């Protein structure tokens, strides 16, 4: 593996994006990926905004207890795909999906699927932190009450568990009943992650979760993602190549509504099969 990275570093040094590509390769090579079966299987998926076809015949797997990084220029369809995985698009008239999104073999695009159950199994964290206008405690308890009836002691235990998993408990344990709006941006985003995992989903979708955060808060979120994949399947949309190399086990590159290429992070950042992938990764467009 080291020799592969060295080879890429030497080859990449001949072009303008060489040093950046070599750095991405080194980051990807440092990750340890455990092989697993697909948790979500997307098959022949087309998606429409009215008459506009935004996604074209997408087929890809999201492997269990791995991180799938989704990269590509703005408007390429990666965030659209993320919202299809837990049927968020159904909230908006005129949007429709054709094909299959199989969660443990069940097509979640079917009309008889209970979207509330689906979204408890496949949780989502958005680009901008979205704490509810209530206390830190109630931000997490709110979602739990929709799905479970817990005693006060059980609720307290679940909230401590979720805040601990989100690397936030030590920072807020003495002010749980104060307004979440008083937290920093990075803390608010970790609160949103805690709120998501509090209902014990199987999959976590992250849509550019650090784009509005400072570098220190970004690092905390990235470390958290690496920790959470031990128990959750994760898909993350990012415009940051370094973040994809640091966080993702597999990477999917999208361009103009098409899935151009998907592979391990190491393969994608050292030896992409498609010229468009190479050009995007090295910053020649995007």
Curated annotation (Swiss-Prot):
It comes from the Bacteria. The keyword Membrane applies. Keywords: ATP-binding, Cell inner membrane, Cell membrane, Membrane, Nucleotide-binding, Phosphate transport, Translocase, Transport. It is found in: Cell inner membrane. Pfam families: ABC_tran. Its EC number is 7.3.2.1. CDD domains: ABC_PstB_phosphate_transporter. One of its GO terms (molecular function) is ATP hydrolysis activity. GO terms for biological process: phosphate ion transmembrane transport. One of its GO terms (cellular component) is plasma membrane. The keyword ATP-binding applies. ATP binds at residues 72-79. It is a peripheral membrane protein. Residues 40-281 form the ABC transporter domain. It catalyses: phosphate(out) + ATP + H2O = ADP + 2 phosphate(in) + H(+). Belongs to the ABC transporter superfamily. Phosphate importer (TC 3.A.1.7) family. The complex is composed of two ATP-binding proteins (PstB), two transmembrane proteins (PstC and PstA) and a solute-binding protein (PstS). Part of the ABC transporter complex PstSACB involved in phosphate import. Responsible for energy coupling to the transport system. This is Phosphate import ATP-binding protein PstB. It comes from Granulibacter bethesdensis (strain ATCC BAA-1260 / CGDNIH1).
């Amino acid at each position: 593996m080291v020799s592969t990275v060295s080879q890429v570093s030497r080859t990449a040094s001949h072009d303008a994006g060489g040093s950046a590509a070599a750095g991405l390769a080194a980051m990807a090579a440092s990750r340890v990926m455990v092989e697993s079966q697909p948790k979500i299987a997307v098959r022949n998926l087309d998606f429409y905004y009215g008459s506009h076809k935004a996604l074209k015949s997408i087929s890809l797997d999201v492997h269990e207890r791995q991180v799938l990084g989704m990269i590509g220029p703005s408007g390429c369809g990666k965030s659209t795909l993320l919202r299809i995985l837990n049927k968020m698009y159904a909230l908006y008239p005129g949007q429709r999906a054709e094909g299959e999104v199989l969660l443990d073999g069940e097509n979640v695009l079917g009309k008889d699927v209970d979207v509330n159950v689906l979204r408890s199994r496949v949780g989502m964290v958005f680009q901008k932190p979205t704490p509810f206008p209530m206390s830190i405690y109630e931000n997490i308890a709110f979602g739990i009450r929709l799905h479970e009836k817990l005693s006060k002691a059980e609720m307290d235990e679940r909230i401590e568990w979720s805040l601990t998993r989100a690397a936030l408990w030590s920072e807020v344990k003495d002010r749980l009943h104060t307004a979440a709006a008083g937290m920093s941006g990075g803390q608010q985003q970790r609160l949103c992650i805690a709120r998501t995992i509090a209902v014990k989903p199987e999959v976590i979708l992250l849509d550019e979760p650090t784009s509005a955060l400072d570098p220190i808060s970004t690092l905390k979120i990235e470390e958290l993602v690496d920790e959470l994949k031990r128990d959750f399947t994760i898909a993350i949309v990012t415009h940051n190549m370094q973040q994809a190399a640091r966080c993702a086990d597999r990477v999917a590159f999208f361009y103009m509504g098409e899935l151009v290429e998907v592979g391990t992070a190491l393969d994608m950042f050292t030896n992409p099969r498609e010229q468009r992938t190479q050009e995007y990764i090295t910053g020649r467009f995007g």
